[in-house]
């Protein structure tokens, strides 16, 4: 048996794994997420390989989605202090780096910030040339503070990234042991949000290096010698090496994988997906089989950013959500991975959301649960209201739309959902997140501002499409499988010359 893929999703409660042969699910497994993460991964992967009778040499690739880096940021855990350099000349001084950050996170991460010569105007003219001497002086100051991660952001570097690239080379020469993140590789237009995303990336670089090494070691522990890919926020894959450099690009991979898996398992490409895990419920919209991306500023751990993220609405409701009888409420706190030990239906002493549906006779596992009928009815109504409200928030119109239920916690939903044309809970719904990881494609995205110089806009669009196609190949896509997924173009009326901004995204199947 050959050409097998393993998909893995590492959540805060469970680690799910799935083994796929083409479009066929051969085996699934769910293991509690372990404190060291790696042993949970190797255990889940080993389980699906054992179930199928496959050999380690049959596995051509492992695709892994994780919330490891997002959780570290939210919990302020394992974060590096960062040196922040802004190439701006005399501009932007009224809005210093990290303005608007939560104070405790800013104090933990922001240990040095310097505004330096450089940057560009909105029309591409230089504000000031880069000053190497000033940059090297800043490097000396950062070395005095023993900083080992640097975030560089230039004004309008999303349009002209060359100064940032030059600054990175200088910093790497002066601080050879430091990680260097530059904003033009991470965010879009919008100085503060792009700078914030770059700082977040920089503070996670040491954790990402250790985590990816641990993930690779978990494969070696079960004798897997195949490439490891990591899921990105937009539902596509990147290499493990790239994930070391850009941990922020994995933040939303959990709900994104679930949505991609829901599309594959249900065969429906346009729908609302409700993904209920042990702790949270995530609701998003599928458009042509891919998660709808948000067009708004995204807050991560209270920090405004502007990188690609799916438009997902989340609340603290899951199978392990704790039920309180005094004020009659459910969540947002959860017993998480201890559900099998603490829930009443498994012999524990904590009333959870799972116990509510067990008391209603909606599930056939565990011990009988004897709860007050009024409490059960009230909590069940609360959960129903939460789901209905979430679905209503993400709908694009008043027209009914299919709703796909996935995740192990989707057993909480046993009622009609307002606005749903139909409700589906596909086979293997509990492993949709891992299926989505295994089915993911690779992508290439190009976002450019071009002066038309008399050319028709269609010619400029074709130029950027070719660049996106090549970017997709560079990311590891099979050339003949590539298709253009999305094109956006807009005139830029504030420029003195005829110009437009064009964004093109291409996706393709992973090359063998």
PLM segments and residue spans:
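N-terminally biased helix-coil "hinge/interface" segments that flank
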Residues: 1-512
């Amino acid at each position: 048996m050959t050409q097998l893929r393993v998909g893995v999703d590492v959540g805060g409660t469970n680690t799910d794994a799935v083994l796929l042969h083409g479009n066929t699910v051969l085996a699934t497994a769910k293991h509690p997420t372990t404190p060291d993460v790696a042993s949970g991964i190797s255990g889940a992967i080993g389980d699906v390989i054992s179930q199928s009778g496959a050999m380690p040499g049959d596995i051509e690739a492992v695709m892994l989605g994780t919330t490891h880096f997002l959780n570290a940021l939210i919990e302020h855990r394992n974060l590096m202090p960062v040196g922040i350099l802004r190439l701006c000349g005399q501009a932007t001084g009224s809005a210093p780096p990290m303005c608007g950050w939560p104070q405790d996170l800013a104090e933990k991460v922001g240990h040095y910030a310097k505004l330096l010569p450089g940057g560009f105007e909105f029309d591409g003219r230089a504000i000031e040339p880069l000053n190497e001497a000033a940059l090297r002086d800043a490097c000396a100051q950062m070395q005095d503070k023993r900083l080992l991660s640097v975030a560089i952001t230039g004004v309008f570097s999303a349009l002209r990234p060359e100064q940032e690239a030059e600054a990175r080379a200088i910093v790497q020469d002066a601080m050879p042991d430091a990680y260097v993140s530059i904003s033009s590789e991470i965010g879009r237009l919008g100085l503060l949000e792009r700078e914030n995303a770059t700082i977040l990336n920089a503070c996670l670089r040491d954790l990402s290096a250790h985590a990816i090494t641990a993930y690779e070691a978990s494969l070696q522990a079960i004798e897997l010698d195949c490439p490891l890919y990591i899921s990105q926020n937009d539902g596509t894959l990147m290499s493990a090496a790239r994930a070391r450099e850009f941990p922020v690009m994995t933040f939303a991979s959990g709900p994104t994988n679930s949505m991609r898996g829901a599309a594959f398992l249900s065969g429906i490409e346009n729908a609302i997906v409700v993904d209920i895990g042990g702790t949270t419920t995530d609701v998003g919209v599928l458009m042509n089989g891919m998660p709808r991306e948000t067009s708004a500023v995204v807050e991560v751990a209270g920090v405004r950013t502007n990188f690609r993220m799916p438009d997902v609405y989340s609340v603290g409701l899951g199978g392990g959500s704790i039920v309180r009888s005094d004020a009659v409420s459910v969540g947002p706190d959860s017993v998480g991975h201890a559900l099998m030990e603490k829930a009443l239906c498994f012999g524990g002493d904590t009333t959870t959301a799972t116990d509510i549906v067990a008391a209603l006779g909606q599930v056939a596992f565990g011990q009988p649960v004897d709860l007050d009928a009024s409490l059960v009815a009230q909590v069940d109504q609360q959960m129903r209201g939460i789901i209905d409200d979430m679905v209503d928030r993400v709908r694009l119109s008043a027209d009914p739309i299919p709703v796909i239920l996935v995740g192990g916690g989707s057993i909480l939903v046993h009622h009609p959902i307002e606005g749903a044309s139909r409700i589906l809970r596909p086979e293997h719904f509990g492993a949709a997140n891992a299926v989505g990881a295994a089915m993911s494609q690779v992508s290439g995205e190009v976002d450019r501002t071009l002066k038309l110089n008399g050319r028709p806009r269609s010619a400029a669009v074709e130029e950027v499409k070719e660049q996106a196609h090549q970017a997709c190949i560079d990311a590891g896509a099979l050339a003949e499988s590539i298709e253009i997924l999305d094109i956006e173009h807009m005139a830029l009326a504030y420029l003195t010359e005829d110009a437009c901004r064009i964004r093109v995204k291409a996706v393709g199947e992973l090359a063998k």
